[in-house]
Amino acid sequence: METIFAQSSAFGKAGVAVFRISGPKSLEVLQLLTGRKDFKPRLMYYQQIISPETNELIDNAMVVYFKLPNSFTGEDVVEIHTHGSKAISIMLINTLLNIDDIRLAEAGEFTKRAFLNNKFDLTAAEGIADLINAETIMQHRQAVRQANGGLEELYNNWRNQLLKIIALLEAYLDFPDEDIPDSILNDVNNTHKNIVNEISNYLNDNRRGELLNNGLKLAIIGPPNTGKSSLLNFLMQRNIAIVSNIAGTTRDIIEGHLDIGGYPIILQDTAGIRAESTDIIEREGIKRAINSAKTANIKIIMFDAEKLDLSINNDIIDLIDENTIVIINKIDLIEPSQIFPIEKKYKCLRVSVKNNIALSSILKNIENIAENIAGFTETPYITNQRHRHYLKQALSHLMAFNLDNDLVLATEDMRMTARCIGLITGVINVEEILNEIFKNFCIGK
């Protein structure tokens, strides 16, 4: 196995930069850079880092040696903690590149080696990637659970039950003359039925985990000049949308990313929806607004309190569902006692975006809907499409399983089911899958 290295911290100015070396020559490289031979594992040392070629001092650093298998990768590992200077990073990287039998690591190669050395399964490796990319508290919680074996335990439980079924069926095939109690086949059928139900229910999760990973789309829609762009600017705490009294100012979808209550929200301000527009570009914007609303996880429908009765049309009303927040804006311009017909049918929030009236209620409603859609629960959810793909394949093999037909075919269905789940956890190793997963890591991880 080659020895690899990379800067694990971000390149640039910082208090500390961390370099990681992994492989059989790690300790030898550390000894070469420091001129010191006696390094005890897991102890930090304050050492000068010197170029072996020029004898030039690169930096005074803290270094530590991890002896295999007690390291992240399961190999001999060295970490060098220097000052976070671009010049130091460049000098140390060039120095390491000039040492024989050591090369720059590929993206995700340290984590890939840890997986190959059985430090964790493939779902945990993906959890580490999600943890690195997590931007909100809820994404962090989901990633931590997965990185610490939450999904591995679930999938391995199913696979172990399947392996027991396979063992029983193979024994039945290998010793056909032996009397095998009917109770064993009944147990096989019952276990099969339970796994079918569990995987079916697990797949029927409305993609909660994937939505939490990728972000929930929130579309702000409504008639022109109701304050949609002003609301977007308020939520983003900066002006990313043009605000104007001229109808049709927003013609395309404007997008921003936000953390509301720990949930990743992708905000979309859309063109005002009105039936009478003759402008070709505006009509295309209206079409996109409606399509955006139809695919959104959360919708905010805004109306102008002064023009509410005139602005309601079926294109807008038809979009209202349980994940919709109906807002009546500009309430400072009407009498508080005024009640609109739409308020009798739907729960509406009365706000004034311009004067910052009741805007906190919008944030709370968004958070409540996001929690209902993708809230963190005790049961770990499917977090990416790869898992869903193989679970669907596993379920199709389970549905084909039938002990009343050919027992050989039934056994093969069980093998294929176990294989699909093994592909998720990495028990069954396919190089193409590994390359696809680990290429999404940053270099140094």
UniProtKB/Swiss-Prot annotation:
One of its GO terms (molecular function) is GTPase activity. Keywords: Cytoplasm, GTP-binding, Hydrolase, Magnesium, Metal-binding, Nucleotide-binding, Potassium, tRNA processing. GO terms for cellular component: cytoplasm. Binds 1 potassium ion per subunit. Its cofactor is K(+). Mg(2+) binds at S229, T250. Its EC number is 3.6.-.-. It comes from the Bacteria. Homodimer. Heterotetramer of two MnmE and two MnmG subunits. Belongs to the TRAFAC class TrmE-Era-EngA-EngB-Septin-like GTPase superfamily. TrmE GTPase family. Exhibits a very high intrinsic GTPase hydrolysis rate. Involved in the addition of a carboxymethylaminomethyl (cmnm) group at the wobble position (U34) of certain tRNAs, forming tRNA-cmnm(5)s(2)U34. This is tRNA modification GTPase MnmE. It comes from Rickettsia typhi (strain ATCC VR-144 / Wilmington). The lineage of its organism: Bacteria, Pseudomonadati, Pseudomonadota, Alphaproteobacteria, Rickettsiales.
